[in-house]
């Protein structure tokens, strides 16, 4: 449901507070070739270092949901060509993703990525393989292309949940873990609020699981702001 502009703002805010390279989802590129070009321009401007773009038809769905539809492979190649042409930083990494596993089959997924590789992308990504055997087959057939392969570590999704070492041993070069931070936050806040209401507006029962206030303030950089206020304030 997030728009291109909303994603740009999220990426920009994250990149402002870290020097760690940011891998930012670009969904479908938010439209046709012109929107795909605008997407990479915005992602670079925001400070991201990597994006992946997928071959789903709009409106897209989570890769581990049912009901997905694909655009023709040639249409995706056109988007990729346009995006690469608009890239200003040669070190910005563009990963081509296919969602064919949830729509057609493994052979189509591999054929699509082979054709996307020919356009000049920097990495390849099959989303939602169903088994370790399929992951091994993806690696075996795509490794000869010489491009890094991405593995999506999603707990309770369509794919088997592997450790990074297990994925690496299968031939994958790097991984994303996009869902677990949200799941952890949801569980922590849910349990805190349930305890708060059950214990009469108190969190004493879970105090050992709460970050101390001073530690949190240090984490968000409050000391720096206080020092700057003292330096420049009246």
Can you annotate each of these PLM segments?
Residues 182, 186-234:
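Extended, intrinsically disordered, low-complexity segments
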Residues 1-153, 157-173, 177, 183, ...:
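Alpha/beta enzyme core
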């Amino acid at each position: 449901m997030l728009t291109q502009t909303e994603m740009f703002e999220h990426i920009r805010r994250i990149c402002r507070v870290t020097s760690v390279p940011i891998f930012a989802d670009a969904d479908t590129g938010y439209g046709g070739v012109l929107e795909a070009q605008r997407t990479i321009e915005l992602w670079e401007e925001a400070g991201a270092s990597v994006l992946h773009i997928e071959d789903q038809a709009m409106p897209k769905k989570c890769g581990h949901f049912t009901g997905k539809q694909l655009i023709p492979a040639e249409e995706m190649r056109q988007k990729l060509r346009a995006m690469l042409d608009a890239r200003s930083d040669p070190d910005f990494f563009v990963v081509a993703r296919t969602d064919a596993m949830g729509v057609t089959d493994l052979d189509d997924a591999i054929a699509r990525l082979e054709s996307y590789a020919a356009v000049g992308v920097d990495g390849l990504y099959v989303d939602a393989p169903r088994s370790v055997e399929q992951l091994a087959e993806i690696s075996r057939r795509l490794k000869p292309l010489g491009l890094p392969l991405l593995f999506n570590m999603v707990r309770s999704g369509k794919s088997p949940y592997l450790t990074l070492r297990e994925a690496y041993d299968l031939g994958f070069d790097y991984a994303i873990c996009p869902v677990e931070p949200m799941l952890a936050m949801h569980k922590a806040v849910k349990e805190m609020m349930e305890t708060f209401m059950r214990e009469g507006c108190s969190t004493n029962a879970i105090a050992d699981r709460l970050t101390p206030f001073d530690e949190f303030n240090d984490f968000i950089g409050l000391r720096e702001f206080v020092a700057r206020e003292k330096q420049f304030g009246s």
